From Swiss-Prot:
One of its GO terms (cellular component) is cytosol. It catalyses: tRNA(Gly) + glycine + ATP = glycyl-tRNA(Gly) + AMP + diphosphate. It comes from Haemophilus ducreyi (strain 35000HP / ATCC 700724). Tetramer of two alpha and two beta subunits. This is Glycine--tRNA ligase beta subunit.
Length: 688
């Protein structure tokens, strides 16, 4: 099979940095899908992305589709010819459609008779004839939320397109894509190297970009260079660079030839909480902060330039000049905020609406204060500290710093509380009330902080559900899904003895007459229990295990988790499948029972296998009772797994629905007791 390397590059104006990698990988995936759909073989696909280009290189691409054998069946021989042996009109029409005569058709014999058939070999199309449409289709399927038009063109793309290059080996593929005539011209760096130049062969890419255009097209290589050089620059200062992967990839998407440099700022700014300085450095300027070995912020930062002059001093001074006003603002806001105690911000919360039907932020604060105290009492936290933290929880939203740097909410509350002399647990709780902020985020460290974090999230869930504004589809403006998962994670991972029904009932009572949904408690609890499914599926736990536990609707998250772990473990037993099937059978039998079911009567057992199961069930009922009380569900199901043999023997030798009512009633009692033992943990009849 003859192959050539294929290159497609789309040269654009600066692409959105946060979307660049996603666009590049989607482009490569779409190209791969197009090739596979066309039946074109290839060895490997590589993708490239810089601020001003998306490119895909396909290695060892077949230069033509493979030939295909086709077989088109026609009419049955019996109906293809008339009594004189002449082809019928139906046979002639079929043959004409195949481009042959009836006489040229083959015949095939099947179990349903003999049929006319046309067999032929269809040559595959040359790859070069397919590529333009494939690339256009791949581009049209890119995840572009807001495409744009430019100049007088009618086509749309994420940014204006200037060049399109398609090379199959050394052959330029002719055509037009996105309103641009395909050419073998690519553009270099905006300031370094040649502005544009010709590429003669797909194999020259991406090296020709580096050699002539001063562009490193490989995204992963640029990322590695930035990471390596940033770590080295920080180490030279005796520090460690704070390099989060999201910011690293964003910076990688901003430069075509990275040059990692270090700049500094005045040490006086270190009197401002580090989080505020870091917020503006990372969020606004895309800089990497540097910390010493003890975790203290150093008066230096790392930035990445897209140019590489012999003397970088002007670039360094320029970045220092840019960041200085932002740090000065943070310093001013901090000093201004310190002139007023955090608690003195409470009256201002009355001027900010949380939600029209649910009141102001002050109303929410009062509810959080009360609910924090309720939760603290239940989990053994300091009630007064929890209530104090709840009272102060939203005060920092009124400060100058948080108004300007919104992502510092919580952490600035912590710093201001410390300055005011609040208890350390109270101060820390103000920061940790928002934890977990995202999937996999850390949880609050203290029970006081857990109390406030839970109260805040439950108040939001109860309030929004209470006015009928629960999430619909992808719309979740109050982030209720995240709040619900946060509640579950805190309770489960901290092993807190809390019941969702009790918490939501307490929360509901704090809203007075504001709530209109009378089913709010059930709605919120069901919503939170439903979030367990997504959480456990991410952990790889089978859906039927989750459903088996959900069927029992345990409303204590820590208890729910213990049941899920137990059922998941139970599924590994050899006896699990048989016992699940037996429980399905028991459920069906009991559903059809037409008499009252009482307690097991051993003296009424007439069959040996019947008595054996009855005795086993009664014995296990006593054995598992203390295990259930301790929520040791794994031990419960391990014990119940021993019932497989007596259960199998029972169904093999005993007629449950005996004609004698007393026998039938007792046998139903045995099965009812058996079922109830398993239902103490979960409905294992739902296991597949």
């Amino acid at each position: 099979m003859t192959t050539e390397n294929f290159l497609v590059e789309i040269g654009t104006e600066e692409l959105p940095p946060k979307a660049l990698k996603k666009l590049a990988t989607a482009f490569a995936d779409n190209i791969q899908a197009e090739l596979e759909q066309a039946g074109l073989a290839f060895e490997k696909i590589e993708w490239f992305a810089t601020p001003r280009r998306l490119a895909v290189k396909v290695l060892s691409l077949a230069i033509a589709q493979p030939s295909k054998e086709i077989e088109k069946r026609g009419p049955a021989v019996g109906s293809a010819f008339d009594a004189d042996g002449q082809p019928t009109k139906a046979a002639e029409g079929w043959a004409r459609g195949c481009g042959i005569s009836v006489e040229q058709a083959d015949r095939v014999v099947t179990d349903k008779g003999e049929w006319l058939v046309h067999r032929a070999v269809v040559e595959g199309k040359p790859t070069k004839d397919l590529l333009v449409d494939m690339v256009a289709s791949a581009l049209a399927k890119l995840p572009i939320a807001k495409p744009m038009r430019w100049a007088d063109k009618t086509v749309q793309f994420i940014r204006p397109v200037h060049t399109v290059t398609l090379l199959l080996g050394n052959e330029l593929i002719e055509g037009e894509i996105l309103g641009i005539t395909i050419a073998n011209v690519v553009r270099g760096h905006r300031f370094l190297g040649e502005s544009q130049f010709q590429i003669a062969h797909a194999d020259e890419y991406p090296q020709i970009l580096r050699d002539k255009g001063a562009v490193i097209a490989d995204f992963a290589e640029r990322k590695a260079i930035i990471l390596r050089d940033a770590q080295a620059k920080a180490a030279a200062l005796g520090g460690v660079a704070d390099i989060e992967d999201d910011l690293l990839e964003e910076v990688t998407s901003l430069v075509e030839y990275p040059n990692v440099l270090v700049a500094k700022f005045e040490e006086r700014f270190l009197a401002v909480p580090a989080e505020a300085l870091v917020y503006t450095m990372k969020g606004d300027q895309k800089y990497f902060p540097i910390y010493d070995k003890e975790g203290n912020l150093l008066p230096h930062f790392i930035f990445v330039s897209n140019i590489n002059p012999q003397d970088p001093s002007a670039i360094i001074e320029g970045n220092e000049k840019v960041v200085r006003p932002r740090l000065s603002d943070a310093e001013f806001f901090f000093k201004t905020d310190l002139k007023q105690r955090l608690v003195d911000q409470l009256p201002r919360l009355e001027t900010v609406l949380f939600q029209q039907q649910l009141g102001t932020l002050r109303d929410k604060t009062d509810r959080i204060e009360q609910l924090s105290g309720v939760i603290a009492e239940q989990i053994g936290a300091d009630v007064q500290k929890a209530k104090r933290a709840g009272l102060l929880s939203k005060c920092d939203l009124m400060t100058n710093m948080v108004f300007e740097f919104t992502d510092t909410q919580g952490v600035m509350g912590m710093h201001y509380a410390r300055h005011d002399g609040e208890a350390e647990e109270v101060a820390v709780a103000l920061n940790e009330q928002y934890m977990p902020r995202f999937a996999g985020d850390a949880l609050p460290t203290s029970l006081v902080a857990c109390s406030v974090a839970l109260a805040d999230k439950i108040d939001t869930l109860t309030g929004i559900f209470g006015i009928g504004q629960h999430p619909k589809g992808d719309k979740d403006p109050f982030a209720l899904r995240r709040a619900a998962l946060g509640v579950l994670r805190i309770i489960v991972e901290k092993k807190l003895p809390l019941d969702l029904v009790h918490l939501v009932e307490k929360s509901t009572g704090l809203f007075g007459d504001k709530l209109t949904n009378k089913a709010v408690v059930a709605d919120v609890v069901d919503f939170m229990l439903g979030r367990f499914r997504a959480w456990y599926q991410d952990e790889g736990i089978a859906v039927d295990v989750i459903q088996a536990v959900l069927a029992r609707r345990p409303t204590k998250p820590a208890d729910f988790d213990a049941r899920v772990r137990a059922v998941s473990h139970f599924r590994t037993f050899e006896s699990a499948e048989a016992l699940a099937a037996a429980n399905k059978r028991v459920t069906n039998i009991l559903a059809k029972a037409d008499i009252a079911i009482g307690e097991i009567n051993l003296s009424a057992c007439v069959e040996p296998t019947e008595r054996a199961l009855a005795e086993a069930v009664l014995a296990l009922k006593d054995e598992v009772r203390p295990l259930i009380a301790k929520a040791n569900y794994t031990a419960v199901l391990t014990q119940l797994a021993n019932l497989r043999t007596p259960v199998d023997n029972f169904f093999d030798h005993v007629m449950v629905n005996a004609e004698d009512p007393s026998l039938r009633q007792n046998r139903l009692a045995i099965l009812s007791t058996l079922q109830s033992l398993f239902l103490e943990v979960a409905d294992i009849s739902l296991l597949q």
